[in-house]
Regions:
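Residues that define the transmembrane beta-barrel architecture of outer-membrane proteins
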Residues: 1, 28, 56-60, 80, ...
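Residues on the lipid-exposed face of transmembrane beta-strands in outer-membrane beta-barrel proteins
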Residues: 1-3, 34, 62-68, 86, ...
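Short loop/turn motifs that connect adjacent beta-strands in outer-membrane beta-barrel proteins
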Residues: 3-28, 69-81, 133-147, 173-201
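Transmembrane beta-strand segments that form the barrel wall of outer-membrane beta-barrel proteins
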Residues: 12, 143-155, 228-229, 254-260
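Long, hydrophobic/aromatic-enriched structural stretches that serve as scaffold segments
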Residues: 16-98
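Sequence/structural signature of outer-membrane beta-barrel proteins
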Residues: 39-43, 71, 89-93, 133-137, ...
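Outer membrane beta-barrel transmembrane domains
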Residues: 42-44, 167, 172-281
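Extracellular loop and loop/strand-boundary signature of outer-membrane beta-barrel proteins
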Residues: 48-51, 109-116, 152, 225-229, ...
């Protein structure tokens, strides 16, 4: 995510049609990304996958993000984020090729159920989010504190949901970012990193709740028949804990995520980690 004097026309056209966003901010940034995500059931050795588990799916997509930030007054900052994501779900996304070759390289279990994956379908998501950050009291050893509240909505044929949550942080040079970037759906953190000191870092904890209207990776294709589950949960939540450190213009962050069950037959909550490396520009 880089500083920008103006927003790319296509992204600006979308942003102007989202009434909850205000991108006329003091600081404007935009960025672009190419990503690939794979979903599989728990038992990948079965040639006929468990119908009560999530279907095989791959999602290859490009996204454009616009971030507008302004300081409202002493100790309070507002950030608006708009993201447009366009991609392909299905065999064309290459999930089978990537997983099978990766498992061959690692000499791991061969996945056998990709024949039942979701069918090809173009995917579109538009995300709008507002975050309000409040500076907390200063502590001994020059420690800083802050907390943030955020809310947003994502609309599209891939996923449609509303989210709200909060985060608290403790450390040094907290103004360098709004939290480390993570794979959506996730807590706010737009990937903006701008260090104010040569060295800094923080620990953080956050929670987010989501009301989910659609998730293609559980509900199946929207425009084509195929694999799906019937017992997706309409509400979900994440608990996230982590640490971020930066030296100069490079930041490394680790996030531990505890995610509630996404469907009734799921064997338990998901627990996973995310590592990100950011370079200030």
């Amino acid at each position: 995510v880089r500083p920008a004097n103006r927003v790319t026309p296509g992204l600006n056209w979308v942003a102007n049609r989202i009434p909850i966003l205000d991108l006329d901010r003091t600081e404007l940034r935009q960025g672009f990304a190419l990503s690939h995500t794979i979903f599989t059931p728990e038992d990948i050795e079965a040639e006929i996958p468990d119908q009560t588990d999530r279907p095989y799916a791959a999602w290859l997509y490009a996204s454009g993000t616009v971030v507008g930030t302004t300081r409202l007054g002493p100790g309070q900052t507002v950030q608006d984020v708009m993201q447009v994501t366009l991609g392909i779900v299905g065999p064309t996304a290459g999930g089978e090729f990537v997983q099978e070759n990766w498992h061959d390289l690692l000499q791991a279990i061969e996945p056998r159920g990709w024949e039942s994956q979701l069918k090809d379908e173009l995917g579109l998501e538009i995300t709008a989010q507002r975050l309000r950050q409040f500076e907390g009291p200063a502590l001994p050893f020059r420690l800083e504190t802050d907390n943030a509240l955020h809310g947003g909505v994502t609309l599209g044929n891939v996923r449609t949901y509303a989210s709200a949550g909060g985060m608290a942080r403790l450390g040094w040079d907290l103004s360098s970012d709004f939290g480390p970037p993570r794979i959506r759906p996730a807590l706010a953190g737009a990937g903006v990193f701008k260090p104010g000191q040569p060295f800094g870092g923080y620990i953080f904890a956050g929670i987010e709740g989501r009301a989910i209207a659609r998730d293609m990776f559980l509900d199946g294709n929207l425009f084509r028949d195929g694999a799906r589950i019937e017992d997706r949960r309409d509400f979900g939540a994440d608990l996230q804990l982590g640490v971020a450190l930066h030296q100069g213009d490079v930041q490394i962050a680790f996030t531990y995520v505890h995610r509630t069950e996404e469907f009734v037959a799921q064997s338990g909550p998901q627990r996973f980690g995310a590592v990100s490396i950011s370079i200030a520009r």
